[in-house]
Structure formats: C-alpha cells, structure tokens
Amino acid sequence: MSSLVQKYNVAGPRYTSYPTVPYWEENSFTKSDWESSVIKSIKESNQKEGISLYIHLPFCEAMCTFCGCNKRITVNHNVELPYISNVLKEWSLYLALLDETPIISELHLGGGTPTFFSPENLQILIDGIFKNAHKAKNAALSYEGHPNNTTKEHLKTLFELGFNRVSYGVQDYNLEV
C-alpha cells in the first residue's frame, strides 16, 4: 500500500488532456497528422458502435471552491449564442473530414455548468449537433447540472432532447469543505 501512495502522491496533469501537457512538443503534430487521426478514430468508432462526444460549456455564474475545471465566471448570458456558434463551427470542421454521417452513441455536456445556458440555447446546440449526425438507438446523453440554476424547464428540454442522465457533482456533504 505504501508503494501505491508513494507512486501516486505527486502532482500531475489532469486526466482531461491527452496526451498530457508534459508530452507536447512544438511542431510535432501537423494539420495533416491531426486530420488523419480524426478520420481514423471517428471512422473506426463509428463503424463499431458510434462516436462519443464531449462538449465543454465553460461558463459558471459563481466559482465553486473545489473546481479545477477550465471555466469562465460570468453572469453575462450574452456569451451563450456566440459560444454555441463556435462549437457548431468546430463540429462542421470535423464533419467536413468524414465521408459518412457519424452515429453518436454518447454525448456529454460538461463544464463549467452546462445549465448556465438557457434551455432554448441548449436546444439550439443539440439540434445543431444532430442536424448532420444520427443518434444511436440506445444513445447515452448526459449533462452536468448545478442545483442553483437547473430549472424544471432545463430538465424538460433536455429530457425531450433525449438526455437520460444528469450529474450534479456533489464533492462533499461537509459544509466546511
């Protein structure tokens, strides 16, 4: 047990970046390399069971003390539509590389706080993603919510869009934490 503690009791990059930052090298990965990698990974996954998408919605109205995520703290909801527009532009870049319509078997909205976005704008985002993609029969669609801003309208809209899982990310029940 002490060897495990010794092995893992060190600072390291967050699991959300791969390859992890210490392994990045300037000019080691060309645009052509990236495109080939995207095409190969999406095509292989799409043919087997469909692709999994994670969409990062980085906005929050308040800072959680435990948060280590990439986020932007703001109460300005005018950021929603421009951000969604850019996500959909990026999605179109991926689609342009493919010769077949992707099948989405998993979609996760993470953050930040995805329910920072209005239900109407979340609908615009999800409709934009599925405009040029198929939803797998048993697709797993999930999102991270926050009890302070997830409304009944959020729940209704996301359910109607096919979302079947929500995570509220309780970190600890100790109020001092």
Features from the language model and the residues they span:
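Hydrophobic faces of well-ordered beta-strands that scaffold small-molecule active sites
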Residues: 51-55, 105-107, 139-145, 166-168
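A short, N-terminal amphipathic alpha-helix
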Residues: 87-97
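Canonical Radical SAM [4Fe-4S] cluster-binding loop centered on the CxxxCxxC motif
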Residues: 50-83, 161, 171, 175-176
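Glycine-rich anion/phosphate-binding loops
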Residues: 78-88, 147-153
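Conserved glycine-rich "GG(E/T)P / GGGxP" loop and the immediately following alpha-helix
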Residues: 98-133, 141, 146-157, 175-177
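Flexible, acidic/Gly-rich N-terminal and inter-domain linker regions that tether
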Residues: 1-52
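Conserved, mostly hydrophobic/aromatic
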Residues: 60, 87, 109, 143, ...
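Short loop/turn motifs at secondary-structure junctions
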Residues: 63, 100-103, 137, 162
